[in-house]
Swiss-Prot record:
Organism: Rattus norvegicus (Rat)
Annotated region (Disordered), positions in chain: 27-52
Taxonomic classification: Eukaryota, Metazoa, Chordata, Craniata, Vertebrata
Residue stretch of the organelle transit peptide: 1-15
The family this protein is said to belong to: Belongs to the class-I aminoacyl-tRNA synthetase family.
InterPro entries recorded: aa-tRNA-synth_I_CS, aa-tRNA-synth_Ia, Anticodon_Ia_Val, M/V/L/I-tRNA-synth_anticd-bd, Rossmann-like_a/b/a_fold, tRNAsynth_Ia_anticodon-bd, Val/Leu/Ile-tRNA-synth_edit, Valyl-tRNA_ligase
Catalyzed reactions: tRNA(Val) + L-valine + ATP = L-valyl-tRNA(Val) + AMP + diphosphate
Function statement: Catalyzes the attachment of valine to tRNA(Val) in a two-step reaction: valine is first activated by ATP to form Val-AMP and then transferred to the acceptor end of tRNA(Val).
CDD domains: Anticodon_Ia_Val, ValRS_core
ATP-binding keyword on record: yes
Compartment(s) where it occurs, according to its Swiss-Prot or TrEMBL record: Mitochondrion
UniProt-recorded name of the protein: Valine--tRNA ligase, mitochondrial
Entry-linked PROSITE patterns: AA_TRNA_LIGASE_I (PS00178)
Length: 1065
C-alpha cells in the first residue's frame, strides 16, 4: 500500500464537517433546552422528584436490610446457556448456516467441532504435508503422559494449553506436526489409590488377594480413569494424533522397557546392591525422591500417621548421655530428633579440632540402652557449633551416617523393619513395636537410667511420603540401581555446549548442580502394578546373604536361563529360576517415552521421521526427575539427545501456595471451570475420592472458602487464554476463577464484534483477495496497521516462547483497537448511503486475520466465527481454521507489496486518542451524559495540527462530541467553554453554554472536592504501609483531581456570571 501523505486522506465521508455524513445545525437535537426556559425548569423539577423518591426507597431498603443478617453478594451471575441442537452425527461438520445466537455460550460454541477435526485428520502429520502452505519442516512433541490416578487438574490444563498453542501455530504455519498422546501407569500412585478403593468398597487389603486378582482390579480402574483423562484432553481442545496414542504399560512400551533394562545391564550400567533407599513403611516399598515431601517444622508439631496408634511429636531435640567407659562421671551428651534409632547406633562422632573432646579421642563409650562399647570417632563433617558438637552415628538409617560409617569401617545395624516396626536386633523389649511407640518406651528407659538430659524445641525438615502420608525411613535394602555418573556427565555437557537448550536459561544452574551431585538411581519398587523386572534369581546357588545371590537378566525366561547356565557352568535343565517380583520405578518407563512412543526398539518410520523430538514442554518441577532421565537414557540407548530444546513453565498453585495434588484434595478439574459447577457437586467429588477423613475435612473447608457460590461456566477458550496469559516462564502461577471469567467476557466481546461485522457485510458481500485490500481513509489505514502490528507481535511471541505476549497483543487488538475504536468510528460510515466499498473490506480483513491469529489459543471460538465468514474472491478457503495459514506481518501487504504497517500513522492517531480521553474526562466532570458538545482544538504547532486534521470526524464520534474544529493559534478562548490543556502544544475547548446547569453542578463538585480533600489530608497525616513511591503517586493523583475540580468550578462560576438574569428576560 502506498504511504500517502496524511493530508491526502480526505474522502467525502472523512472530511472536516460538523458530524458524520450529514451537516448538523448548531442547536443539536440531543442538547437540552437553554437553562432557565420553562421546558428546562419542568425537566429539572421532575428529575429532582425522581431522585428524592429513589433516595427514600434506598433508605427504606437499607433500614429493612439492617434487621436481617447480611448475605454476601455473589461475585458473578449465571449466564443464559444456549445449546447447539441441530442433529449432527459425531464427526460430521457443524451446521453454521443459521445466525449466531445473541450472546456467547461456550456449550454452543464447543459442540461438534472436535470430533470433526479428528475425523478429518487435521491433527495428523500426513494431512499437514498436503497443505498449500506446507514448509517441509517437521515439528514433533510428546505430551507429558499424565498419571492414570484420576482426572486432570489445572496444572495439567496449563501444560495442554501451552503445548497445544505451539502445536496449532506450527500446524497453521505449514509444518508437519506430530503431537503424541499417552498416559503413564504411575506405579506407586495408582496402586495406592486402588488399595484405598478396595478397602473402602470391599474391606479387602492387597495382600489378601492374589497378584493376578489385584492387577485385574487395577486394569479395570485404569480403563475407567484412562477414558476420563482422554475426555478431558478432548474437552481442552488438545489437537493430538489419537491414532498414535500409547500407554506406558501397553505391549510396545513393555518391550521397550525390557530392552532398555537388558541393554543397560549388559553395559554394566545397571546392577543389584544393598544400599540405603527412601522407604515408605505404609506402602512397604522403596519410593523415588520426587515422592518425598520435605515438610518444614518450626518446632514441636504433633502428627497422626497411618498405622501408628498414637499421635507423634516432631520438632523436638532429645539430649542423651553416653557414659565414657572406664571414667565414671564422664559422659558425652548427644542431641537427636530420632531417639527410636538409638538401638542402631554404632558410634559417636565429634570434629577432630573440637577442643572439648580432644582428651577423649580414641576412647570407648557405653551405649545408653545396651551398655555395649561404642567408639568415639572424629570426622570433619561434624559441625562443632551445632548442639553439643557430638552426634550419634546410625549408618543403617541415615544417608549422612552411612557415608561416615563407610569412611570409618562401621558395621550398620538395621533396627527398623519394612513395616515400620522394630527388629529383633533391638531386643525382646522393643521387637515388633511400632517405631514411634518404641520411641516413647526408649525415652522412659533413658529417664529411668538417669541418662536423659533434656528436651527442647528444634526446627527441622521432616520427610513425608506424598503417597501415604507416612514418615519416610531410610532402610538398607537389596535393590536394582542404574549407574548415573557417566550418563549424567554427558547430559551436563550437552547443556554446557548448547546442544541442549533449556528455557528459561536460569534452569541451567539447577541442571548442572543436580548432575554434579547425582547418585545412582534406585529403580526397583516393591509393588505389583508396573513393569516386572526382567531379572531372575538362580536357585540352588550358595549364598551367605542376599548380597551374594546369583542373578541373571534376560528378555525372556529362556534367554535368562541360557545366561544362568553360562554364568554357573550348570546345564539349563538343572537350573531353577525365580523372577524378581518387584517392578520398575515409573520414572524408568517414563524416561523412555520420547522414543518408545515412536516404536523403539523397532526401527519404525515414525522413529526415523520424528525422532529426536523438536521440543519438550513441561513443568519446571520435572526438570531433573523426568527431563534429566530422558536425556540420560535417550542419549545412551539411541545415540542422540531425545530433543534439542526444553521449555519449562511455572507451576500452578492453590490459594495457599501449595502444589496441586490429588492427595491434598486441592485439585480443580478443568471441566468444572469450563462447564461451571455448584458447590454441592464439588464437595460430593471430594467425598467420592480417595481422601481420608482428615484430608477430606481440610479440602472441603478450603473449597467452601474459595468457591462459596460454586464455579461459573467459563468455557474452554477462556480457560486456555487465561492460562497462557501469565508469564509462564517465571514464578509460580496463582490462577483465579475470576480471571478466567474475565476472559469469558472477552469471548462475548469477540462474539458481539463478529455479529456486528457480519450484519455490516450483509449477504451479498464478496471479500477481495488480501493483496487488493486498500484503505480509503486514515481510520482504515490505522486499523490495518494495528492488525499488521498484532501479527508481528504474535509471531515474535511464538518464536520467543512468550505466550503472554501473544495473549496481550490479541486482547489489546480485539478489545482496544478493533471494538473500542475502529468499530465505533466506522458505524456512521457503514450506515451512510451509499456505503463506501473500503470499510467493509477492511472489516472482513480484521475478522479473518484476527481470528486466524487467535486460533492457536481459542480454537473453538475462532473456528465457530471463522466458518461464518464468506470465502475470499479467487482463493480456495481452507476447510478449517486449524489448517488455515497463520498470518505474519510480512504477509499482510497491499498492491505493490506495500506493508499494511504504518508506524507513523499509528503515532499520529495515538495523539488523537489522548484528545479523546481528555474530552471524555471533561464530559464526565460536567456530567454531560447525552449532550454532544462542540469542540475546538488550538495548537501552537502547525505540524501537530496537520497530524490531527485527518481524524477530526472520528475524533468527534469517539469522544461522543459534536463538530470538531480548530481555533487559530493566538485566538482568544471562547466564552462559556471548558478548557483542558494537553501537554504544552494543544488546548482543548469544549462547549458548556446551554448544556450544563451551574447551580446544580457546583454543589456536586464541592461535595466531591470535600471528599477528595479529606482523602488527601488523611493520606498526608498518617503513616501508611505502602512504599514511598506508591504513596507519592496517590498524593499526586489526588492533587491533580482536585486541581481539575477547581478548574471546573471556576468555569461553572464564570457561566453563572455571564448568564442573563431570569428577571431580565
Amino acid at each position: 500500500m502506498p504511504h500517502l501523505p496524511l493530508a491526502s486522506f480526505r474522502p467525502p465521508l472523512w472530511g472536516l464537517r460538523p458530524s458524520w455524513g450529514l451537516a448538523r445545525p448548531r442547536a443539536l437535537c440531543t442538547q437540552p433546552e437553554p437553562h432557565g426556559s420553562p421546558v428546562s425548569r419542568r425537566n429539572r423539577e421532575a428529575k429532582q422528584k425522581r431522585l428524592r423518591e429513589k433516595q427514600a426507597a434506598l433508605e427504606a431498603g437499607l433500614a429493612e436490610k439492617s434487621k436481617t443478617p447480611a448475605v454476601p453478594t455473589k461475585a458473578w451471575s449465571h449466564k443464559e446457556v444456549v445449546l447447539y441442537e441441530i442433529p449432527t452425527r459425531p464427526g460430521e461438520k457443524k451446521d453454521v448456516s443459521g445466525p449466531l445466537p445473541p450472546a456467547y455460550s461456550p456449550q454452543y460454541v464447543e459442540a461438534a467441532w472436535y470430533q470433526w477435526w479428528v475425523r478429518e485428520g487435521f491433527f495428523k502429520p500426513e494431512y499437514q504435508a498436503r497443505l498449500p502452505q506446507a514448509t517441509g519442516e517437521t515439528f514433533s512433541m510428546c505430551i507429558p503422559p499424565p498419571n492414570v490416578t484420576g482426572s486432570l487438574h489445572i496444572g495439567h490444563a496449563l501444560t495442554v494449553a501451552i503445548q497445544d498453542a505451539f502445536v496449532r501455530w506450527h500446524r497453521m504455519r505449514g509444518d508437519r506436526v506430530l503431537w503424541i498422546p499417552g498416559s503413564d501407569h504411575a506405579g506407586i500412585a495408582t496402586q495406592a489409590v486402588v488399595e484405598k478403593q478396595l478397602w473402602r468398597e470391599r474391606r479387602v487389603r492387597r495382600h489378601e488377594l492374589s497378584r493376578e486378582d489385584f492387577l485385574r482390579a487395577v486394569w479395570q480402574w485404569k480403563q475407567e480413569k484412562g477414558g476420563e483423562i482422554y475426555e478431558q484432553l478432548c474437552a481442552l481442545g488438545a489437537s493430538l494424533d489419537w491414532d498414535r496414542e500409547c500407554f506406558t504399560m501397553d505391549a510396545g512400551s513393555s518391550a521397550a522397557v525390557t530392552e532398555a533394562f537388558v541393554r543397560l545391564y549388559d553395559l554394566g550400567l545397571l546392577y543389584r546392591n544393598r544400599q540405603l533407599v527412601n522407604w515408605s513403611c505404609t506402602l512397604r516399598s522403596a519410593i523415588s525422591d520426587i515422592e518425598v515431601e520435605s515438610r518444614p517444622l518450626p518446632g514441636r508439631t504433633v502428627l497422626r500417621l497411618p498405622g501408628c496408634p498414637i499421635p507423634v511429636s516432631f520438632g523436638l531435640l532429645v539430649s542423651i548421655a553416653f557414659p565414657v567407659d572406664g571414667d565414671p562421671g564422664t559422659e558425652i551428651v548427644v542431641g537427636t530428633t530420632r531417639p527410636e534409632t538409638l538401638p542402631g547406633d554404632v558410634a559417636v562422632a565429634v570434629h577432630p579440632d573440637d577442643p572439648r573432646y580432644t582428651h577423649l579421642h580414641g576412647r570407648q563409650l557405653r551405649h545408653p540402652l545396651t551398655g555395649q562399647h561404642l567408639p568415639l570417632i572424629t570426622d570433619t563433617t561434624v559441625q562443632p557449633h551445632v548442639g553439643t558438637g557430638a552426634v550419634k552415628v546410625t549408618p543403617a538409617h541415615s544417608p549422612a551416617d552411612a557415608e561416615m560409617g563407610t569412611r570409618h569401617g562401621l558395621t550398620p545395624l538395621s533396627v527398623i523393619a519394612e513395616d515400620g516396626t522394630m527388629t529383633s536386633l533391638c531386643g525382646d523389649w522393643l521387637q515388633g513395636l511400632h517405631r514411634f511407640v518404641a520411641r516413647e518406651k526408649i525415652m522412659c528407659t533413658l529417664r529411668e537410667r538417669g541418662l536423659f538430659r533434656g528436651l527442647q524445641e528444634h526446627p527441622m525438615v521432616l520427610p513425608i511420603c506424598s503417597r501415604s502420608g507416612d514418615v519416610v525411613e531410610y532402610l538398607l535394602k537389596s535393590q536394582w540401581f542404574v549407574r548415573c555418573q557417566e550418563m549424567g556427565d554427558r547430559a551436563a555437557k550437552a547443556v554446557e555446549s548448547g546442544a541442549l537448550e533449556l528455557w528459561p536459561s536460569f534452569h541451567q544452574k539447577s541442571w548442572q548442580h543436580w548432575f554434579a551431585h547425582i547418585g545412582d538411581w534406585c529403580v526397583s519398587r516393591q509393588l505389583w502394578w508396573g513393569h516386572q523386572i526382567p531379572a531372575y534369581r538362580v536357585g540352588g546357588e550358595k549364598a551367605e546373604d542376599d548380597r551374594e545371590e546369583c542373578w541373571v537378566v534376560g528378555r525372556s525366561e529362556a534367554e535368562a536361563r541360557a545366561a544362568a547356565a553360562k554364568q554357573t557352568g550348570r546345564p539349563e535343565a538343572e537350573l531353577t529360576l525365580e523372577r524378581d517380583p518387584d517392578v520398575l520405578d515409573t520414572w524408568f518407563s517414563s524416561a523412555l517415552f520420547p522414543f518408545s512412543a515412536l516404536g523403539w526398539p523397532q526401527e519404525t518410520p515414525d522413529l526415523a521421521r520424528f525422532y529426536p523430538l523438536t521440543l519438550l514442554e513441561t513443568g519446571s518441577d520435572l526438570l531433573t526427575f523426568w527431563v534429566g532421565r530422558m536425556v540420560m537414557l535417550g542419549t545412551q540407548l539411541t545415540g542422540q539427545l531425545p530433543f534439542s530444546k526444553v521449555l519449562l513453565h511455572s507451576m500452578v498453585r492453590d490459594r495457599q501456595g501449595r502444589k496441586m495434588s490429588k492427595s491434598l484434595g486441592n485439585v480443580l478439574d478443568p471441566r468444572d471451570i469450563i462447564s461451571g459447577q455448584e458447590l454441592q457437586v464439588l464437595q460430593a467429588k471430594l467425598r467420592d475420592g480417595n481422601l481420608d477423613q482428615g484430608e477430606l475435612a481440610v479440602a472441603a473447608a478450603a473449597q467452601k472458602k474459595d468457591f462459596p457460590y460454586g464455579i461459573p461456566e467459563c468455557g474452554t477458550d477462556a480457560l486456555r487464554f487465561a492460562l497462557c496469559s501469565h508469564g509462564i516462564l517465571g514464578g509460580d502461577l496463582h490462577l483465579s476463577v475470576s480471571e478466567v471469567l474475565n476472559y469469558r467476557h472477552f469471548c462475548n466481546k469477540l462474539w458481539n464484534a463478529l455479529r456486528f461485522i457480519l450484519r455490516a457485510l450483509g449477504d451479498d458481500f464478496v471479500p477481495q483477495p488480501a493483496e487488493k485490500v486498500t484503505p480509503s481513509s486514515p481510520m482504515d489505514a490505522w486499523i490495518l496497521s494495528r492488525l499488521a502490528f498484532a501479527a508481528n507481535e504474535c509471531e515474535r511471541g511464538f518464536l520467543s516462547r512468550e505466550l503472554s505476549l501473544v495473549t496481550h497483543t490479541l486482547y489489546h487488538f480485539w478489545l482496544h483497537n478493533l471494538c473500542d475504536v475502529y468499530l465505533e468510528a466506522v458505524k456512521p460510515v457503514l450506515s451512510s448511503a451509499p456505503c463506501p466499498p473500503g470499510p467493509p473490506q477492511v472489516l472482513f480483513s480484521c475478522a479473518d486475520v484476527g481470528l486466524r491469529l487467535l486460533a492457536p489459543l481459542m480454537p473453538f471460538l475462532a473456528e465457530e466465527l471463522w466458518q461464518r465468514l464468506p470465502p475470499r474472491q479467487g482463493g480456495s478457503m481452507a476447510p478449517s481454521i486449524c489448517v488455515a495459514p497463520y498470518p505474519s506481518g510480512h504477509s499482510l501487504v497491499s498492491r505493490g507489496q506495500e506493508s499494511w504497517r504504518q508506524p507513523e500513522l499509528e503515532h499520529c492517531f495515538s495523539r488523537v486518542q489522548e484528545i479523546v480521553q481528555a474530552l471524555r474526562a471533561l464530559r464526565a466532570t460536567y456530567q454531560l451524559t447525552r449532550a454532544r458538545p462542540h469542540v475546538l482544538l488550538q495548537s501552537s504547532d502547525p505540524g501537530e495540527q496537520g497530524l490531527v486534521q485527518p481524524f477530526l470526524e472520528p475524533l468527534g464520534v469517539l469522544s461522543h462530541c459534536g463538530a470538531v474544529g480548530f481555533l487559530p493559534p493566538g485566538a482568544a478562548a471562547p466564552s462559556g467553554w471548558a478548557l483542558a490543556p494537553l501537554g504544552d502544544t494543544i488546548k482543548i475547548y469544549m462547549e458548556l453554554q446551554g448544556l450544563v446547569d451551574p447551580q446544580s453542578q457546583l454543589p456536586r463538585l464541592a461535595a466531591r472536592r470535600q471528599k477528595l480533600q479529606k482523602q488527601l489530608d488523611d493520606l498526608l497525616n498518617r503513616t501508611v504501609s505502602d512504599g514511598p513511591a506508591e504513596r507519592q503517586q496517590r498524593i499526586s493523583s489526588l492533587q491533580l483531581e482536585l486541581s481539575k475540580l477547581d478548574q471546573a468550578a471556576s468555569h461553572l462560576q464564570q457561566l453563572m456570571e455571564e448568564a442573563p438574569d431570569a428577571r431580565e428576560l
